[in-house]
């Protein structure tokens, strides 16, 4: 099974999501999803998260907080989720992958029709923990 890291990025009670490319060759094309990607051989989870966020946003948070691990049999992978607070101005983030990025409140996320269920579930879980970080 592939190992995957995902970041739940938050700022001012909003969450940053990526509109994935609309390519049939990728998983969950044209959906609002979390930033992240595959862990390469010999790479640690935090190292993989740093690489992915640097590639996708030209940014990496000062701290990552572990949230959960989930085995996804549908996509044959194990996802490790981290929470990251974005302390830089929004204009400092540069989209390197995907069609777009956008900040959403948790209520806005619930209204999206093209978001994988696991993204919604993990955002809800993170939302409960953020005030304790």
Show which residues each predicted segment covers.
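Conserved N-terminal beta-strand and adjoining loop/helix that marks the start
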Residues: 1-17, 35-38
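Short connector loops at helix/strand junctions that flank enzyme active sites
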Residues: 2, 10, 29-34, 61, ...
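Short loop/turn microsegments at loop-to-beta-strand junctions
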Residues: 4-5, 44, 99
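Active-site-adjacent beta-strand/loop module that shapes the phosphate/pyrophosphate-binding cleft
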Residues: 11, 60, 70-92, 102, ...
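Recognition helices and adjacent regulatory flanks at domain boundaries
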Residues: 14-16, 21-24, 51-55, 59, ...
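Nudix hydrolase/Nudix homology domain
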Residues: 25, 29, 94-133
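The catalytic Nudix box helix
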Residues: 34-67
